[in-house]
Amino acid sequence: MATKVVLDFEKPLVELEAKLGEMRHCLRSSSREQAPNEAEALQNEIGTLEKKVEALRQSIYKNLTRWQKVQLARHPERPYTLDYIYMITCDFVELAGDRHFSDDKAIVGGFARIEDRVSGFSQPVMVIGHQKGRDTKSNLYRNFGMAQPEGYRKALRLMKLAEKFRKPIITLIDTPGAFPGIEAEERGQAEAIARNLYEMAKLTVPVICVIIGEGASGGAIGLGVGDRILMAENSWYSVISPESCSSILWRSWNYKEQAAEALQLTAPDLLSQGIIDRIVPEPMGGAHTAPEAMAGTLKGILIEELSALLPLSSEELVNSRIEKFSSMGVWNEEG
């Protein structure tokens, strides 16, 4: 059985939950031997402890620092792109290769269908996203979710295919950054990302981008130009990671918490700045605590956004998308 990953700030809660579990086990195993008043006293203690656990849970997860949200975004049990694809869509057909060099396993994508039997909504879509691994072997296979140039070119090929068949595009972003190796630079990493930005701005079909975990720098923006930009509640999106920012400004990774605060990289930060359009709520404790509930929430929001975008003409989509991104980063100077 795999060991549960516990983050530093979660340890007090986990310890209290373990104590609660022991008390419940004690009550179940010895209830027949205990006197009624002893069992009642233990039950009262359990009730008191349950309230303490819930109060501590609320206190921790409703007051997360920016760095703690970065940690949650990187949680190894968090749902990844393929998890969401299989929970949200049906009839997924994965497509491979960039038709130039190779098939980058850090990017996955293909046609699928989003359906809702209650509302009757049914829409074929192209889903594309970064894919990380769960262990050392799969992370090496997926290159830790860091795409090569051929990954971004594969993504663009699939986007153009979706445009040809008039199908909306959904991108799921979760990467620590584009792969920075020499071989990636030699094959045109910067050009591949820049080309995606240029082409995505002009796509004549609806494009919805969702940051589901990490959204680091050019590796994220290479899949991040769309009509709607959504962010999971405990994800982050920034030009640089807190550790890299800390190492540049303070010559040490020890100031990553301060860097995270300065970068303002969380979903509420970016919503207030007009960078994203909507926050996708997560279950208490993060998406990994209830993946299916998280997928259900995201599916409902995607259906809402698709329903709003599908009636728009190609010209309306392109014009509003270009205007949306052109207006970012505008500020006024006073004094």
Curated annotation (Swiss-Prot):
Give the location in the cell: Cytoplasm
Q: Give the UniProt entry's GO cellular component terms.
A: acetyl-CoA carboxylase complex
Give the metabolic or biological pathway: Lipid metabolism; malonyl-CoA biosynthesis; malonyl-CoA from acetyl-CoA: step 1/1
EC number(s) stated in the UniProt entry for this protein: 2.1.3.15
InterPro entries from the xrefs?
A: Acetyl_CoA_COase_a_su (IPR001095), ClpP/crotonase-like_dom_sf (IPR029045), COA_CT_C (IPR011763)
Q: A single Gene Ontology molecular function, please?
A: ATP binding
Q: What are the entry keywords? A: ATP-binding, Cytoplasm, Fatty acid biosynthesis, Fatty acid metabolism, Lipid biosynthesis, Lipid metabolism, Nucleotide-binding, Transferase
Q: Which GO terms describe its biological process?
A: fatty acid biosynthetic process; malonyl-CoA biosynthetic process
Tell whether Transferase is among the UniProt keywords: yes
**Domain CoA carboxyltransferase C-terminal: from-to ranges:** 48-308
Q: Which reaction does it catalyse?
A: N(6)-carboxybiotinyl-L-lysyl-[protein] + acetyl-CoA = N(6)-biotinyl-L-lysyl-[protein] + malonyl-CoA
What Pfam families does UniProt report for this protein, alphabetically?
A: ACCA
HAMAP family under this entry? AcetylCoA_CT_alpha
Q: How does it assemble?
A: Acetyl-CoA carboxylase is a heterohexamer composed of biotin carboxyl carrier protein (AccB), biotin carboxylase (AccC) and two subunits each of ACCase subunit alpha (AccA) and ACCase subunit beta (AccD).
Q: Which family does it belong to?
A: Belongs to the AccA family.
Known role = Component of the acetyl coenzyme A carboxylase (ACC) complex. First, biotin carboxylase catalyzes the carboxylation of biotin on its carrier protein (BCCP) and then the CO(2) group is transferred by the carboxyltransferase to acetyl-CoA to form malonyl-CoA.
Protein name, UniProt field: Acetyl-coenzyme A carboxylase carboxyl transferase subunit alpha
